[in-house]
Amino acid sequence: MAFNLTSKYEPTGDQPAAIKQLVEGVERNDPAQVLLGVTGSGKTFTMANVIQQTQKPTLVLSHNKTLAAQLYGEFKQFFPENLVEYFISYYDYYQPEAFMPTSGLYIEKDLAINQEIEKLRLSATSSLMSGRRDIIVVASVSCIYGIGNPEEFRKSIVVLHKGQQINRNKLLYSFVEILYNRTTRDFTRGTFRVTGDTVDVYPAYADIAYRIQMWGDEVESIQMIEPETGKRISEQKSLTLFPANLFVTGKDSLNNAIHHIQDDLMKQVQLFEMEKRYGEAKRIQERTEFDIEMMRELGYCSGIENYSRYFDGRMPGQRPFCLIDYFPDDFLLVVDESHVTIPQIRAMFGGDRARKTNLVEYGFRLPSAMDNRPLTFDEFESINTQAIYVSATPADYELQRSEGAVVEQIIRPTGLLDPQIFIKPTVNQIDDLLDEIQERIEMGDRILVTTLTKRMAEELTKFLDGVGVRTRYIHSEVKTLDRVEILRELRLGVFDVLVGVNLLREGLDLPEVSLVAIMDADKEGFLRNVRSLVQTIGRAARNSNGKVIMYADKITASMQQAIDETSRRRATQLAYNELHGITPITVNKSKDEIMGQTKVADSNKFNKQYIEPEGEPSLAADPVVAMLNKTELTKMIDRAKKDMDKAAKDLDFVEAARYRDEMFALQKIIDSK
């Protein structure tokens, strides 16, 4: 099936020339190109057109999960008839296994897996193995971490056809071999159940299940069903069932792996004993023999990824298989916000190796654990045959690798200009910020505020919320799907101000935001260098009333460079608009479009806490609230009631109860006045 781009827009501004140049580069087999596009210039739409014209399977690599979710939503809208998948780390919480030699402290691995994201990861690998070429996978840098051998995954696929002859027990055994569990109670993803001649199986990567009805040893019918009710959706001629886990292996491979593990265990024990390190020898023998016994009994063990080299048939030091190995050889790599993503990829290997060296050295793991790792940067480059680096501020690496093949996209299709920048002193900055926020709220716009520290973000959020400004705070500890939900609510107007530290820079599509406030803009460092400032300024570039305020007592070199570059682009854009008679307009997305772009958030149905609670009720306990007049307090009660009603409507009764208690506490303050 071919890619079929669906959009009500046509390429305009710099887009047609950019698309033409990039497509020509791909067709010439140029190994690398750079798309230097300003915020809001439609870089994602440009890349969608390149994918449409080149018809290549594409991996879109993003540096954070929030941006990956947004890109996933946009590509789903552009290509509704094609396969668009999402592949990020599935850990809500992850504490890696580690050993601290100085204190003798061993830390067990601890983790919490997000089942919805695990489903999406399996869906991505299953789609890649389906043979279709019309596939886009949006991934975070977790895609360079080791996963199962794609050949083992492919060999484990179960294919059934209506009328096929197969023994029922053999069919059930084939499900068990690819890590599906038989159940008589809860029918969940990755399980199957048997009732007489009827077998129901719930794929680990889907939201629907299948019913296989047997007549003796013949597959009489295959039906797609609703998992919860068993209601038939449609009749199927065939069923292709992919494994329930990325680390799947056949029985022969398992037995062969155990044999090699035992050989390496013997060598490691002998090495420790020669060095008279008997404690380490005893530890590695006990731990490894326990793992081997688990593998023999269950087919897997805790930490089985540390033995992945044996299952994959790799030599020591040989790179692991990763998501990229599931792609065809001629795939196209798009590195979004490459100035941040590339350094992330560089850093992955070193941090992983340092931790595992101690585990091997002190007898907690065999040396094979060192080969369960992310790719080195050289390995990543070796399998990255054709790349397009996308950034408003490309770094030296991308510019050098592309050998000057830089495609500029400065003109926005909407005619929008880079925002005006104002510098204000830090004296009375909070009062000034509050005035600016109120002005923007009256216009129906949203506001982003970026601070240098988490503590300042917390305090500012509490203050703004306390004086009646609907504010949320986003930070690195907020779960991935919750972040997407927060951004969705900002865009839909559930609240007006979003405060953050380092999550409000690259790539976020927020046309409703007309004001970006940068606190402590003159504090040179990672969060206030030229690239960071240009990216942060860009958050206000999708709105015709875009404005940036830098609160600073001096103009640093980074500030000046960011202001100069923004002014250069703004002048180019103004000249283009005057030449073509274009009036800048904000492209406000409809509610349906916003819901579609943030669709991945719908996977998450759990309670959300955006501001860390410090006692109940949070607002009424704030001393600022006690100083407000009755009119302001009444407004806060009305707002709390609306929030309570909304929470109750969403069946979020814990949150509804919190708002109810807040209302009662605020009413007590009014009564006491």
Curated annotation (Swiss-Prot):
Keywords: ATP-binding, Cytoplasm, DNA damage, DNA excision, DNA repair, Excision nuclease, Helicase, Hydrolase, Nucleotide-binding, SOS response. One of its GO terms (cellular component) is excinuclease repair complex. Residues 24-182 form the Helicase ATP-binding domain. Its main location: cytoplasm. It comes from the Bacteria. GO terms for biological process: nucleotide-excision repair; SOS response. Residues 634-669 form the UVR domain. It is found in: Cytoplasm. ATP binds at residues 37-44. Signal peptide: none annotated. The keyword Glycoprotein does not apply. Gene3D superfamilies: P-loop containing nucleotide triphosphate hydrolases (3.40.50.300), UVR domain (4.10.860.10). A motif (Beta-hairpin) lies at residues 90-113. InterPro entries: Helicase/UvrB_N, Helicase_ATP-bd, Helicase_C-like, P-loop_NTPase, UVR_dom, UVR_dom_sf, UvrB, UvrB_inter. Forms a heterotetramer with UvrA during the search for lesions. Interacts with UvrC in an incision complex. The UvrABC repair system catalyzes the recognition and processing of DNA lesions. A damage recognition complex composed of 2 UvrA and 2 UvrB subunits scans DNA for abnormalities. Upon binding of the UvrA(2)B(2) complex to a putative damaged site, the DNA wraps around one UvrB monomer. DNA wrap is dependent on ATP binding by UvrB and probably causes local melting of the DNA helix, facilitating insertion of UvrB beta-hairpin between the DNA strands. Then UvrB probes one DNA strand for the presence of a lesion. Belongs to the UvrB family. This is UvrABC system protein B.
